[in-house]
């Protein structure tokens, strides 16, 4: 009886040791699991390295705004262009900040700072003192600083490209134009103010003048005479029915 019990116990132990071990029953700390985790980590590291190298070889395309800003910053101007006084104009200013108008808007006042390149400041025009008689202009005008002028007509009648921003000594300056134009072509129903409408037809119109401005000629910056609005005048025409 005891011999039979020993035989059954030995057969049971042999069956347990002979059973194959499945990979699903491997403990978490077993060498097989460690090899798999090391392999996946190595593959992940290689993938990150490959993607990083790909990004360096093929960088992401830049936005259009970034390209425009870069192109503006690349337009470098020689400071010698500003040393000749004949190229300076009282209606053209290079500055890093917008210049203000005077309070009465009858003269030009520039910012008194070290950033302004154009030191040729036009003196204020002397105006007669306003009395109680009620003096009025024939035409109403408005004067503004124009900062984003990109195109203009030169003295030869050709359309040229005006430089909006200028890179000088690693600092960006903007080119401003002081322009004057008519506020209204007919300040009064009959046309210009103070004109005898019984004998004359009249209206207000904006006139232009030439100023030196910095323009682009191919890939080079050059001075050119361009037309800008500079005044508002009254045009009168005699009525033909009086003849």
From Swiss-Prot:
Domain of life: Eukaryota
Molecular function in Gene Ontology: growth factor activity; lipid binding; metalloendopeptidase inhibitor activity; nerve growth factor receptor binding; toxin activity
Name of a matching Pfam family: NGF
Disulfide bonds: 139-204, 182-232, 192-234
Tissue specificity statement from the Swiss-Prot or TrEMBL entry: Expressed by the venom gland.
Pro-piece positions: 19-125
Ranges of compositional bias, category Basic and acidic residues: 47-66
GO biological process: cell surface receptor protein tyrosine kinase signaling pathway; modulation of chemical synaptic transmission; negative regulation of neuron apoptotic process; nerve development; nerve growth factor signaling pathway; neuron projection morphogenesis
Signal sequence, renumbered to the chain: 1-18
Keyword presence, Mitochondrion: no
SUPFAM superfamilies: Cystine-knot cytokines
Glycosylation sites: 148, 151
Cellular localisation: Secreted
Family, per entry: Belongs to the NGF-beta family.
Subunit structure: Homodimer; non-covalently linked.
Known role: Nerve growth factor is important for the development and maintenance of the sympathetic and sensory nervous systems. It stimulates division and differentiation of sympathetic and embryonic sensory neurons as well as basal forebrain cholinergic neurons in the brain. Its relevance in the snake venom is not clear. However, it has been shown to inhibit metalloproteinase-dependent proteolysis of platelet glycoprotein Ib alpha, suggesting a metalloproteinase inhibition to prevent metalloprotease autodigestion and/or protection against prey proteases.
This protein's name: Venom nerve growth factor 3
